[in-house]
Amino acid sequence: MNILDTRYLAERREALKQEILDSFLENFPHYEEMTESFEDIRFEEEEIESWKEDFEDELKEIEEIDDVENELGSEFEYGVTLVDVDDWEEYVEELLEDIGYIPKDFPSWIEIDWEATANNVKVDYMEVIYQGNSYLGRG
């Protein structure tokens, strides 16, 4: 099952920012005094254009994580479970068993419409996009 925790995304974003900052300071030491953090990097400077192209994927991923955070709001920093929409039905089944709504000794001959149940639970979740995949999370 493809599941993410937004705390992982926050850590990933910080690691990407640090990687970019380290490379920037290594390649452009004359900016060191005015560049204390990733946010201080002058991406608009002409002399760093070709260097910036090497980090296109990383910058895009940082932007995607920022978008996920903006969509989920303040809950992002506390850890929101994001479930790939393709795994949603399986996730709901496990969730309902784990929290006790479906007893462990539930008779196998009783059929549950998991698709309809998953759709009913989905009402409390919102969809976000990360790395080209759609995820559902409570925000």
Spans of model-derived segments:
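Acidic interaction surfaces
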Residues: 1-139
